[in-house]
């Protein structure tokens, strides 16, 4: 019950807080997007809600059509995964660094980027502020895509901004 209250509080705070999103760098071989919001929650509660990805990720941006099938195992080499049934599933990203309630880093190509010759580094930072926590979500992507990666920067920024 406490976890559900934390998640609900996180989601309500996000809905009420002004968010900031920007593609900070773009080139044919990659891009960086940064999304940030201040939530009315402690870093521990913000962290707990963030790693409960199945509770807040949009079902529109899943393979299964059901965000409840999404999960993050917040340990080194843990999985940001989506279950597709009894034995089927997708590894969207792999956890590469964990500092609970402070930072979570994942590596891989999210969504259609996972089908291309690219790699990404996604970092979620949690910083205590007066009255809440600043959640900063940075995703840097580089590699090869026919026609150039710059065309993916806007759509990826939109999806991540919608999630945050």
Put a short name on every predicted segment.
Residues 19-71:
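Hydrophobic ligand-binding cavity/cleft-lining segments
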Residues 46-49, 80, 95, 106, ...:
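Hydrophobic pocket/interface hotspot
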Residues 22, 71, 85-132, 140:
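Hydrophobic-ligand binding "helix-grip"
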Residues 1-8:
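Bacterial N-terminal signal peptides that target proteins for export
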Residues 28, 134, 140-164:
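A conserved amphipathic terminal alpha-helix motif
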Residues 53-92, 101:
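Short beta-edge strand/loop motif at the mouth of beta-sheet-based domains
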Residues 30-38, 67, 79, 90, ...:
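Intrinsic-disorder/low-complexity, polar/charged segments enriched in Ser/Thr/Lys/Arg/Asp/Glu/Gln
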């Amino acid at each position: 019950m406490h976890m559900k209250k934390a998640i609900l509080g996180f989601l309500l705070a996000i809905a009420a807080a002004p968010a900031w999103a920007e593609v900070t760098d773009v080139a044919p071989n990659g891009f960086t997007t940064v999304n940030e919001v201040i939530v009315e929650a402690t870093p521990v509660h913000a962290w707990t809600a963030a790693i409960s990805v199945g509770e807040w990720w949009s079902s529109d941006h899943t393979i299964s059509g059901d965000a409840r099938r999404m999960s993050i195992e917040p340990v080194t080499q843990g999985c940001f995964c989506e279950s597709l049934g009894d034995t089927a599933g997708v590894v969207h990203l792999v956890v590469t660094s964990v500092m609970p309630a402070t930072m979570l880093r994942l590596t891989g190509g999210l969504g259609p980027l996972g089908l291309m010759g690219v790699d990404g580094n996604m970092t979620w930072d949690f910083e205590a502020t007066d009255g809440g926590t600043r959640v900063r979500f940075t995703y840097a992507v580089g590699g090869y895509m026919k026609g150039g990666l710059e065309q993916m920067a806007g759509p990826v920024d939109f999806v991540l901004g919608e999630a945050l």
